[in-house]
Regions:
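Low-complexity, glycine/proline-biased repetitive segments and flexible coils/loops
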Residues: 2-10, 18-298
Length: 298
């Protein structure tokens, strides 16, 4: 009987499997120009039991994979902040692990003449408004993120830039002309062993003041200075530019994988990663990987 089992294992018929928990965050959107909307956070997908995915969703199921098989691995870069009047912040790039794809965060809108935020993993914020306009925030992807904020200029005739949506919450509507809108909140995960917040939306560009940002989101600019970038490898949105200033770049994404320490991961040449071991598991944090990169286990 044992010889039969060994033969089946050698033939790959009874090949062992491994269960992998993951946190996959996409690159975030860049902020808009000139009282621009904040960039939306990168899409957020998590399988750690008891934690949350983006968009208010519960944790997803872990993946069951085969050893000695290559699986796709990509870490999405953040989108560039807008540098010209009327130019929308660029959306980020998707992050991928095997069958899991997190959607890029949407770029923030720009004023003159004013534009809506871009749809994405989390949506970008609408730009500042004039002439009683309403510039809406972009929508977020279901189970990955929330919508960007809307700038409503119909109340007092003008509005500042609204914040980008976060993985953990939508950005609020802005109805005044001084302080830029708050970025949406992100989500915390302890997949690495300590709790870290990621996936915050970028703050909206203001006219003398800026709103709050958390979890890697970049602050909007209150004046003529360039807005802050989202934090690298958090999927935090770029801040919106203030009066005649540029938007900040979106933060790059990240892929974090937790698996039994009986297995060793092998990464293709374009991957930048670090691996720690403890409690019977290994945790690999991948901070850079191109569209053709892979990971396998043995």
């Amino acid at each position: 009987m044992l010889n039969n089992i060994v033969g089946l294992l050698d033939a790959g018929i009874l090949a062992p499997t491994l269960s992998i928990d993951y946190l996959v965050i996409a690159g975030a959107g860049g902020g808009g120009h000139q009282q621009g909307g904040g960039g939306g956070a990168g899409g957020y997908r998590c399988s750690v039991s008891g934690e949350s995915s983006g968009g208010g969703a519960s944790a997803e199921s872990s993946l069951t994979l085969l050893p000695n098989t290559s699986y796709a691995l990509t870490v999405g870069g953040g989108g560039a902040g807008a540098t010209t009047t009327g130019g929308t912040g660029a959306s980020g790039n998707n992050s991928v692990f095997s069958s899991i794809t997190s959607d890029a965060g949407g770029g923030g809108g720009s004023s003159s003449p004013g534009s809506a935020g871009v749809t994405g993993g989390s949506g970008g914020g609408g730009s500042g408004t004039g002439n009683n306009q309403i510039n809406v925030g972009g929508s977020g992807t279901t189970n990955q993120g929330f919508a960007g904020g809307t700038s409503d200029g119909t109340v007092i005739g003008f509005g500042t830039g609204a914040g980008g949506g976060g993985a953990g919450g939508a950005a609020p509507t802005v109805i005044q002309f001084t302080t830029g809108g708050n970025g949406g909140v992100g989500v915390s995960s302890s997949i690495t062993g300590s709790s870290v917040g990621r996936g915050g939306g970028g703050g909206g560009g203001g006219n003398g003041g800026v709103g709050t940002v958390t979890d890697g989101g970049g602050a909007g600019s209150p004046n003529s200075t360039i807005a802050s970038n989202g934090t690298a490898n958090t999927g935090g949105g770029g801040g919106g530019g203030g009066q005649v200033s540029d938007g900040g770049n979106g933060g790059s994404g990240v892929v974090i994988l937790k698996y039994p320490d009986l297995f060793t991961a092998t990464f293709s040449g374009g991957v930048t990663q670090s691996t720690s071991t403890g409690g019977g598991f290994k945790v690999s944090t991948i901070t850079a990987a191109g569209v053709s990169d892979t990971v396998s286990w043995a």
